């Protein structure tokens, strides 16, 4: 008798768990779909140095208020080992093409500003860092699902290339040259 009761409870918990996962999953998919299929999304990236960048997403095209340079947006976290390993290479590329290109880091975590500043100092990051809710909105529009993810845009706001994981500096260099032409 105890076995039957246990079995019934187990089955109820199993089906309840599965159904709530499906509900969460469908809600999440709906949120993503509405965000990526929206005709007009505007937001502002806020940088630790006080600078702001206005971003507009309209009919699956991006425009940035700063059109002087090509941009490599790097989505990452403080706990991601490949993200940390990529930093010296990104510093090199940011310095090499500083007149026509910039690396922009977007943290996808809600750390306190002081924690992020400590991370930047410890890891010797030499490129702008954006923090805040807009980073999450931008990552949803671009369907970022893992870190590190990097997305390269030319100065006109056209998406050139997307990368997932640790990418060799030489490969990034070649694509950056294409983006700044």
Question: What function would you assign to each model-found segment?
Answer:
Residues 44-71:
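A short beta-strand-turn-helix
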Residues 122-126, 133-177:
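Thiol/disulfide oxidoreductase modules built on the thioredoxin-like
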Residues 69-71, 76-79, 146:
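Short pre-active-site segment immediately N-terminal to redox-active cysteine/selenocysteine motifs
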Residues 72-73, 103, 150:
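Hydrophobic beta-strand anchors of alpha/beta hydrolase catalytic cores
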């Amino acid at each position: 008798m105890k076995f039957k009761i246990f079995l019934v409870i187990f089955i109820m918990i199993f089906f309840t768990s599965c159904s709530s996962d499906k509900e969460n999953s469908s809600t999440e998919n709906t949120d993503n779909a509405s965000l990526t299929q929206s005709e007009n999304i505007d937001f502002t990236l806020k940088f630790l140095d006080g600078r702001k960048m206005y971003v507009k997403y309209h009919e699956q095209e991006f425009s940035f208020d700063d059109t002087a340079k090509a941009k490599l947006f790097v989505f990452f976290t403080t706990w991601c080992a490949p993200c940390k390993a990529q930093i010296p290479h990104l510093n090199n590329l940011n310095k090499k093409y500083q007149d026509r290109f910039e690396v922009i880091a977007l943290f996808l975590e809600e750390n306190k500003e002081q924690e992020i500043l400590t991370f930047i100092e410890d890891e010797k990051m030499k490129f702008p860092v954006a923090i805040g809710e807009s980073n999450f909105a931008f990552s949803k529009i671009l369907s970022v699902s893992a870190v590190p993810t990097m997305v390269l845009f030319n100065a006109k706001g056209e998406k050139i290339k997307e990368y997932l994981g640790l990418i060799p500096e030489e490969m990034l260099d070649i694509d950056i040259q294409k983006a700044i032409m």
